[in-house]
Amino acid sequence: MPLPGETHITEVRTMVNEATITRLYEMRLSTMATSYRQQMCDNGINKLSFDERFGLLVDIEWTARKNNRLKRIIRSADFPISGACVEDIEYRTDRKLNREQIANLATCAYIAEKHNIIILGATGAGKTYLSCAFGISACRHFYSVKYIRLPDLLDELSVARGEGIFRKVIQGYKKIDLLILDEWLLSPLSESESRDLLEIVEARHSRCSTLFSSQFDPAGWQVKIVEGPLAESVLDRIIHDSYIILIEGEESMRKQKGIK
């Protein structure tokens, strides 16, 4: 049985600890607060020095914040395949993917260098999965990422022009570290669509990275954009500043996996 003095000391210590936990919550250090409470219930923790115990609390809070930040970045990217990752890419012989090239791109050095990626392949080749895998790799490096289909982007830009916020939208896209444009130039664009598309591509050039996912060879891109000389200039810069990945394959990935 503890002596009366020892009981008083324990009660005071508990009050101090609870006050500390309350302040941690008020400072939005909830993970640290929870871990501190767990330490209070762990008799073995007393074997550690104060610095060691404090270091554990800081590490746990830091890790939780990093994980939460990563989740927010991935969620805001709007990936259609949120579980895609480069580790799960299938390197079947018929796909002729360069494992070393993909591993190098997964380091995201190309983003730091403001380069682009072009992914080419037929319908069902796995372009969207590979695009999302590169996007999630970028998220893991805490780059901002946005996935969007080109038709949806053109609709967004058209609406922005009508509402008088076109410049604001363009400025927003200039801040995204990696913009993934899926279904790139599947069909010819109108004059206004061509103008809007070239505007956003030009605004991002040499400032940030873009991933273009397309069924068609870059040699045929220009004929789908109305703005002739300007289109040629912009597209030429895109192509010469990009890493190109061609996904081949005798069967589509959907057929391989039994997806209709």
Which residues are covered by each model-predicted region?
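Intrinsically disordered, low-complexity and often Lys/Arg-enriched segments
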Residues: M1-T22, K255-K260
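Conserved phosphate/pyrophosphate-binding and hydrolysis machinery centered on Walker-type P-loop NTPases
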Residues: E26, N43-L48, F79, Y91-R95, ...
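Interdomain "pre-motor" coupling segment immediately N-terminal to P-loop NTPase/helicase cores
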Residues: S30-S82
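Extended interfacial segments that mediate partner engagement and assembly in macromolecular machines
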Residues: N67-L120
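Conserved P-loop
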Residues: L97-K175
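Residue-level preference for the first positions of well-ordered beta-strands
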Residues: N116-I118, L178, S209-L211
